[in-house]
Amino acid sequence: MKKMSRRQFLKGMFGALAAGALTAGGGYGYARYLEPHMIETTEHTIKSSLIPHGFDGFKIVQFSDAHLSDYFTLEDLKTVILTINESKPDLIVFTGDIIDNPDTYQHHQAVIPLLRKLNAPFGKLCIYGNHDHGGYGTAVYKSLMTAGGFTVYRNGYQTLSLADGSKIEIASLDDLMLGNPDYEGTLSRLSDRLFSILLVHEPDAALKTTDYPVNLQLSGHTHGGQIQLPFYGPIITPPYGKVYTEGMYQTGSTHIYVNRGLGMTRLPLRFLAKPEITVFTLKSTN
């Protein structure tokens, strides 16, 4: 039997205490029925001299970790889609985990027309999360997202080009937990002369990706811990989500953003970790 570290033990104890506190303090109803539907739109401006003038004001919307289930439903997804379209994005990216349990979910076909309603002139891109590969869901995810109008990436690369010839780069890595991420084969294609965006589900990929010319990494996976304690932060974070847990970080010239996601897994609770849609606006400083 694998021994538990002191830190893991303490986190488990805090988790049990927090669950008890939520129940005893009447916070359970808030964490179960209110906060999971309090979707925040977070806005960030990304500045770089590598961003061409033609891409100044270019708007990217990220959503992540829908975990469609009985707890985050199709009605919730409709609200998300309306919110995203109202922001008038140029590009939409989904950073993994569309369905909580792909092998048991009963409404795959109903998801497709909702995803088709998302509009962005430069397209809709998505990557795999661990739940998309899990439960024999790899092919299901690709079929569903493609039918919904998304380009599905696994260790992919492309450039976005304007009529004036200006470009930015987008790369993606397969899921770290259940996929086969190809760091060198994918990221060696990036140029240090172009502004680059990396899509990867697990944020701690940045421990390796900052060795490459990545300017902006967009990730999800952690749900912001899903349950946080004041002055302590997330009680439990998943594998590959221990270092970067939520929000914006900067390491050298790389900005790393960890979206808190939309749905829930394991426990149908969110506390001090509201679901999130993120809007990024590119700003040229050249």
From Swiss-Prot:
Predicted to be exported by the Tat system. The position of the signal peptide cleavage has not been experimentally proven. InterPro entries: Calcineurin-like_PHP_ApaH, Metallo-depent_PP-like, Metallophosphoesterase_sf, TAT_signal. It comes from the Bacteria. A divalent metal cation 2 binds at D97, N130, H221. One of its GO terms (molecular function) is metal ion binding. A divalent metal cation 1 binds at D65, H67, D97, H223. The keyword Lipid biosynthesis does not apply. Binds 2 divalent metal cations. Keywords: Hydrolase, Metal-binding, Signal. Its cofactor is a divalent metal cation. Residues 1-31 form the signal peptide. SUPFAM superfamilies: Metallo-dependent phosphatases (SSF56300). The keyword S-adenosyl-L-methionine does not apply. This is Uncharacterized metallophosphoesterase YkuE. It comes from Bacillus subtilis (strain 168). The lineage of its organism: Bacteria, Bacillati, Bacillota, Bacilli, Bacillales.
